[in-house]
């Protein structure tokens, strides 16, 4: 009887402790992996002139698909359509690449002019309400989430640097972060509620942009959405490590499996440092996918058997396409062969992941 009484007393106490721990976890500020706290480099010389800000894109996000006219596999580029597409999105991609480059320059050089220039670029677009149009198609909403991931990922290095470079720029920081929050909320609307047959690498990249925005703006709701999208993705990975919706890309199936990995590895790495371990989701789906891709890079025969097509290896010859190896090997004890593949291709720099991926995932905290 005494034991039973003690159990009745202990259980509510344990439950209360668990609830309190949960509340503390929920209240904790969101953080990036340790490398994002790296100090700004020692000042080297004077900054050059600040390039002109690309005109803020405030128009309709209805763009031509570079696969226009292709069959359901969406694997054959339409050269004429691609040229039109590149012309339509030039200001957006100039912004992504240019702002990321300016942040990288500042983190390396410590020149105040580079910081002022980067913040001017971003705050100009923020004040204009760029990329917020409600008039969009699939290609347009894809550009919105890619740009958000690029810009918020680069800005994150400024936000969390131990040098506190944003301390003297509170107003611009607020404008930029409010803009990111608006875009993040829109990206969630854009990519929520899709049927499983429509959820592919685009949704994964949307989830990465929302995860990056969540950490920059300390928005737990955005963080939770990104984690939930990761879980959907993980449960699309089959027992052999294939993504059925990417196998539909036929001759580009292997390339698209590889393209799915950067956002998923980044989300998992960011979730991990915020107390959410996604490595075992669907019995280690991320690891199965990564290993399947690297085996395919060595020998594409399995992908050829699955798709009935010779694989287009063009993208897979570009080192930066493997930038996912940095967050991935921060999560897992990578086998020697994978570590060698990573080392051979480093340093990784991907503007869609915010710039210097190798630097922010280095053991030395970015040095």
UniProtKB/Swiss-Prot annotation:
Instruction: Supply the EC number(s).
Output: 4.2.2.3
Record-linked Pfam families? Alginate_lyase
Q: Where in the cell is it found?
A: Periplasm
Gene label: algL
Chief place of localization: periplasm
Q: Which GO terms describe its biological process?
A: alginic acid catabolic process
Keyword entries, A-Z? Lyase, Periplasm, Signal
Q: Which GO terms describe its cellular component?
A: periplasmic space
User: Is-annotated flag, keyword Protein biosynthesis?
Assistant: no
GO MF annotations, alphabetized:
poly(beta-D-mannuronate) lyase activity
Q: What does this protein do?
A: Catalyzes the depolymerization of alginate by cleaving the beta-1,4 glycosidic bond between two adjacent sugar residues via a beta-elimination mechanism. May serve to degrade mislocalized alginate that is trapped in the periplasmic space.
Per UniProt, substrate binds at 65-66, 138-139, 256
For this protein, the record's InterPro entries field holds: Alginate_lyase (IPR022859), Alginate_lyase_dom (IPR008397), Chondroitin_lyas (IPR008929)
What catalytic activity does the UniProt entry give for this protein?
Eliminative cleavage of alginate to give oligosaccharides with 4-deoxy-alpha-L-erythro-hex-4-enuronosyl groups at their non-reducing ends and beta-D-mannuronate at their reducing end
Instruction: State the signal peptide span.
Output: 1-27
For this protein, the record's CDD domains field holds: AlgLyase
**What is the protein name for this chain?**
Alginate lyase
């Amino acid at each position: 009887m005494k034991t039973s009484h003690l159990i009745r007393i202990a259980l509510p106490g344990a439950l209360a402790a668990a609830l309190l721990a949960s509340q503390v976890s929920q209240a904790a500020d969101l953080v990036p992996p340790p490398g994002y706290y790296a100090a700004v480099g020692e000042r080297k010389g004077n900054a050059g002139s600040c390039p002109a800000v690309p005109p803020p894109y405030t128009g309709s996000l209805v763009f031509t698909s570079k696969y226009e006219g292709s069959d359901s596999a969406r694997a054959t580029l339409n050269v004429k359509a691609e040229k039109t597409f590149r012309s339509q999105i030039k200001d957006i991609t100039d912004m992504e690449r240019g702002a990321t480059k300016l942040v990288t320059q500042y983190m390396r050089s410590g020149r105040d002019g580079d910081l002022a220039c980067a913040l001017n670029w971003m705050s100009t677009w923020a004040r204009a309400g760029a990329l917020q149009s409600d008039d969009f198609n699939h290609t347009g909403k894809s550009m919105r989430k890619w740009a958000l991931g690029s810009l918020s990922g680069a800005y994150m290095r400024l936000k969390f640097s131990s040098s506190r470079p944003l301390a003297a720029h509170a107003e611009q920081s607020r404008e930029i972060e409010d803009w990111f929050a608006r875009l993040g909320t829109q990206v969630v609307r854009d990519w929520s509620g899709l049927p499983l047959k429509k959820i592919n690498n685009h949704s994964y990249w949307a989830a990465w942009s929302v995860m990056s925005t969540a950490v920059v703006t300390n928005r737990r709701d955005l963080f939770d959405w990104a984690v939930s999208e990761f879980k959907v993705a993980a449960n699309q990975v089959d027992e052999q490590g294939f993504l059925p919706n990417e196998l539909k890309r036929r001759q580009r199936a292997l390339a698209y499996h590889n393209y799915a990995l950067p956002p998923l590895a980044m989300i998992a790495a960011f979730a991990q440092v915020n107390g959410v371990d996604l490595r075992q989701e669907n019995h280690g789906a991320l690891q199965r996918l990564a290993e399947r891709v690297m085996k395919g890079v060595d020998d594409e025969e399995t992908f050829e058997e699955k798709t009935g097509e010779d694989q287009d290896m063009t993208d897979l010859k570009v080192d930066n396409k493997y930038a996912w190896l940095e967050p991935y090997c921060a999560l897992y004890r990578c086998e020697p062969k994978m570590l060698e593949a990573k080392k051979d291709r480093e340093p990784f720099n991907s503007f869609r992941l915010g710039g210097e991926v190798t630097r922010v995932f280095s053991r030395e905290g970015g040095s």
